[in-house]
């Protein structure tokens, strides 16, 4: 089955759906390695249908500098309540287990790219949060 909005095998590693059972591993734990952008959405939400694919495209273009996790708020109400999601779409970015940035509502494509670039920069702007470059520099 082809997932809407993903391209190629690499996107599967960068973009995934999560649930209440896997949120901690998919977002909090994963954000210790690289920033994780979390898209809170619902199937009936018109703006979500526009924002989601645009966000997926920007994350894929970041080539591993960030990951994206999607939360269907209808299926994962506990997560939405705990993070006080009042309207959708809502997007949060997590790094080192903490929310570091975010926005509500649909935004323009240029703003989405700027957001992803800003979040990627917090993690070093490279896959692994710049760890490879730091190790190379230390050697």
Segments from the language model and where they lie:
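A short glycine-leucine-enriched loop at secondary-structure breakpoints
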Residues: 82-86
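Proteins that catalyze or organize thiol-disulfide redox chemistry
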Residues: 1-63, 77-78, 88-90, 95-139
